Amino acid sequence: MKKKVKVVGAIIENDSYEILCALRSPKMVQGNLWEFPGGKIEEGETISEAIVREIKEELKCDIEFIEEFNDNTHEYENVIVNLITARCKIVSGTPKAYEHSKLIWLPIENLETLKWAPADIPAVKKLIEKV
């Protein structure tokens, strides 16, 4: 039986209506693919608590949870990932790539030019449809 993991991904939008995209490190599972930054929800955490904590840990900036955006489950070879993405905004600090290879800001209509991790694709498509 495959392990199930519940994770959060932050859809962080700036004042220019661009979305923060994170390139997974080659050392990570799904390396060299793009994702919305985030991570595992710890036991007892709400989605908003998890996303604020994960972004503080990964990008060293503070965000505000705005709203849940998409809930998607994707089955990989060894694990089932339930990814909940949420719209967020930065309240202090500047995101820096510590765990990722690179961070970029992209207009929503250009998101599909990147090669995304499979679990993130439904949220990317939903964002583009809403433009």
Question: How should each PLM-predicted stretch be described?
Answer:
Residues 18-57:
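Conserved Nudix-box catalytic region and its N-terminal flanking loop in Nudix hydrolases
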Residues 14, 62, 71-94, 104:
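Active-site-adjacent beta-strand/loop module that shapes the phosphate/pyrophosphate-binding cleft
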Residues 10, 47-55, 68, 86, ...:
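Hydrophobic packing within well-folded, soluble alpha/beta domains
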Residues 1-19, 40:
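Conserved N-terminal beta-strand and adjoining loop/helix that marks the start
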Residues 87, 96-127:
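NUDIX/MutT-family hydrolases
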Residues 58-64:
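Short secondary-structure junctions
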